[in-house]
From Swiss-Prot:
It comes from Macaca fascicularis (Crab-eating macaque). This is Interleukin-2. The gene is IL2. The keyword Repeat does not apply. One of its GO terms (biological process) is adaptive immune response. Its main location: secreted. Keywords: Adaptive immunity, Cytokine, Disulfide bond, Glycoprotein, Growth factor, Immunity, Secreted, Signal. It holds the Pfam family IL2.
Amino acid sequence: MYRMQLLSCIALSLALVTNSAPTSSSTKKTQLQLEHLLLDLQMILNGINNYKNPKLTRMLTFKFYMPKKATELRHLQCLEEELKPLEEVLNLAQSKSFHLRDTKDLISNINVIVLELKGSETTLMCEYADETATIVEFLNRWITFCQSIISTLT
């Protein structure tokens, strides 16, 4: 009688482990990665919103796609798809009075974190909203996304 329960318990445990059921350590790792992503996005936003940025009005003319719904880590696929355009806009805006240090490194860091968080198996097709967003709106929405996910993990 107990043997069947033990075998069921072992089978369930193996199923959970193989399906990468979240553990407290993986939750903590996810939270740390989200915090790093949040800081990188905030650093870019702060650089853009710097009062000395003469190219802000030009940067606001570029539009970015936002997902209709971004509530899960797998939705980071949509952020990943917009990283190249983001990098291009940031590079266009570089000047003597406005310079984001290591734009390429920041975008690379964001890309690495996003890939780790969403997982390599994600084949989500992003459903984008009808309206596009400015660079400031884009960054603010992804910052809010990170904060929202972090709050659910704590």
